[in-house]
């Protein structure tokens, strides 16, 4: 097998090993969940980005076309399988095959299932070959500082694990609304719909 192919496969495996990244965040969630009820399972909702007619980013390599929607789903399934080996953890997925779900529908599904954490999984593309690595977006501190703090802690834990797998560290980030969208308390909202709606629904939302 060529060296380039080996490197690519290693990176793909690192992506699938994102299953381990969520495990890294479990202690943070357990502290919060056990404050309410030690018997209550931790509910994690995985959101494989895109789906159906929305293919997301696309990359051609070695004669094959890879679509983001498919890679996101594969990673989510690997994460779910790994997470379900832990006692006291319940995992849901916003989609289990190739179909489209609206952004609002994804968070509504998480809320319906009593989510403690919502994790959207994405793989970006760039025309610049030097752009690579991983980052995690988490909620800002506005409107509900507790959710913001929890989200930041889990985001950092996930990012640490991804960096340990060999991915370039692009940091843990927040992105505020650029259109002056506000939370109910008139504070500046988060930019990303799934993070904003997760916060107003009572749980932290991340984008990995």
Predicted regions and their residues:
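Short glycine-rich His-centered loop
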Residues: 41-65
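Short, Lys/Arg-enriched, disordered terminal segments
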Residues: 1-12, 34-35
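Short, functionally important structural connectors and interaction interfaces within domains
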Residues: 4, 21, 184-187
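Sec-dependent signal peptide cleavage junction
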Residues: 22-39
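Sec-dependent N-terminal signal peptides
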Residues: 7-25
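Hydrophobic alpha-helical membrane context
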Residues: 22-23, 59, 134
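Active-site-proximal helix/loop segments of hydrolytic enzymes
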Residues: 38-41, 66, 70-208
């Amino acid at each position: 097998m060529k060296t380039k192919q080996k490197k690519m496969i290693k990176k793909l495996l690192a992506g699938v090993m994102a299953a381990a990244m969520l495990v890294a965040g479990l202690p943070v969630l357990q502290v919060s969940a056990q404050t309410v009820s030690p018997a209550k399972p931790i509910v994690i909702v995985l959101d494989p980005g895109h789906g159906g007619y929305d293919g997301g980013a696309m990359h051609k390599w070695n004669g094959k076309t890879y679509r983001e929607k498919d890679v996101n789903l594969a990673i989510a399934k690997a994460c779910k399988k790994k997470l379900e080996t832990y006692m006291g953890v319940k995992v849901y997925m916003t989609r289990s095959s190739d179909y489209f779900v609206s952004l609002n529908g994804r968070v509504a599904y998480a809320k319906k299932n009593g989510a403690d954490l919502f994790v959207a999984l994405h793989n970006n593309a760039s025309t610049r070959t030097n752009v690579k690595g991983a980052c995690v977006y988490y909620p800002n501190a506005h409107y509900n500082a507790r959710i913001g703090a929890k989200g930041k802690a889990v985001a950092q834990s996930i990012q640490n694990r991804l960096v340990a797998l060999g991915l370039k560290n692009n940091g843990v980030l927040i992105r505020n609304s650029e259109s002056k969208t506000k939370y109910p308390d008139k504070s500046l909202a988060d930019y990303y719909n799934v993070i904003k709606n997760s916060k107003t629904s009572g749980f932290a939302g991340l984008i990995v």
